[in-house]
Amino acid sequence: MANNVGVLLATDMQALPDSVEQWAIKNYEDKLSGGASLQVAKNILESSFKLEAGTSSMGAVVSLVQTPGLHSPAYLAEVARVLVSGGDLIVQEPLLAEAQEQKCSSAQTKAQLERNLLLAGFVNLEVVDSVVGVEIAKACTTSSVALNVVAVKSSKPSWDTGSVFQIRKKVSNQNGNFRTSGNYQPVKLTAGETVDDFPLNSKPAVKVDLSSDFKNDEEELIDEDDLLTEEDLKAPVLPAAESCAPTKKACKNCTCGRAELEEKEQETKLTTAQINNPTSSCGSCGLGDAFRCAGCPYRGMPTFKLGEKVFSGFLLWNQYIRSVPLISKLGNITLGGSLLVADA
């Protein structure tokens, strides 16, 4: 700890008795040696709990208040700011004897005070003898509220934010012997040693041996095929043509039969005149579906030349034969290559 750090007495009183300053000089003689001074901060309530001391400038702080509840987390955080790492802190204030209706609204219990100290980062809390000379505020001395002056000593940790320190570990070797790292020093492992991060007093983990579950090979196993029912073994039924997505035409690789239904429907829509002498008002009907409008009767048909007969599959060809009286009288008609053969 630096030699120039001092001791701070903080209070909400207008002035501290001389006996309190003498007590501080006697108890912190080691910290006041080497040119360090004893400083007094009065009326901390009026200064909004802001201390004029610099950051990490005090080796010890003694906060003596006569108003209950002044040691709030915000004020204790300000005290931690002015304390050096490892500095001592004594807080003293009137506390409630036990949890009860608070007529003095700011009063808190000893447990609440210790909780505030822990939240502010202080450690090593212990109750010490109170400093004589600081009494309870008269505004809170009512017969219905039991208040006792209590002093709690604590210290600021010796490490700062971002500090790195070693964690004590337990080391075991192949022989089962254990050794520790001593006073939190790094452990250097030798060959065959392992590090155990569990606390020294922790119980060993329970080991579960599952290998015995597979030693008996004679046990009867369940055939997964026996779990299948007749419904599971049935082939799935393909959806009907109506189950296709609501598109204008069948899919490119249609397998549900919709393409055939559309072709039949298209063939039945064409009249004899449209088959024998196809015409087009737009001139694009014979170029294919890419050039046909949505209402074109030739949608789905292959390309053809306007003014020539349209042949689209066996059904359309059969319809065309039935519509021509002369050919229908010839009897059986077969199509071989590009020749039309009719039996009289």
From Swiss-Prot:
It is found in: Cytoplasm; Mitochondrion intermembrane space. Monomer. Signal peptide: none annotated. A motif (Cx2C motif 1) lies at residues 282-285. GO terms for molecular function: 2 iron, 2 sulfur cluster binding; 4 iron, 4 sulfur cluster binding; electron transfer activity; metal ion binding. [2Fe-2S] cluster binds at residues 244, 251, 254, 256. GO terms for cellular component: cytoplasm; mitochondrial intermembrane space. Component of the cytosolic iron-sulfur (Fe-S) protein assembly (CIA) machinery. Required for the maturation of extramitochondrial Fe-S proteins. Part of an electron transfer chain functioning in an early step of cytosolic Fe-S biogenesis, facilitating the de novo assembly of a [4Fe-4S] cluster on the cytosolic Fe-S scaffold complex. Electrons are transferred from NADPH via a FAD- and FMN-containing diflavin oxidoreductase. Its cofactor is [2Fe-2S] cluster; [4Fe-4S] cluster. Its main location: cytoplasm. This is Anamorsin homolog 1. It comes from the Eukaryota. Residues 244-256 are annotated as: Fe-S binding site A. The C-terminal domain binds 2 Fe-S clusters but is otherwise mostly in an intrinsically disordered conformation. Pfam families: Anamorsin_N, CIAPIN1. Residues 170-233 are annotated as: Linker. GO terms for biological process: iron-sulfur cluster assembly. Residues 282-296 are annotated as: Fe-S binding site B. The keyword Oxidoreductase does not apply. Keywords: 2Fe-2S, 4Fe-4S, Cytoplasm, Iron, Iron-sulfur, Metal-binding, Mitochondrion. InterPro entries: Anamorsin, Anamorsin_N_metazoan, CIAPIN1, SAM-dependent_MTases_sf. Residues 1-169 are annotated as: N-terminal SAM-like domain. Belongs to the anamorsin family. The keyword DNA-binding does not apply. [4Fe-4S] cluster binds at residues 282, 285, 293, 296.
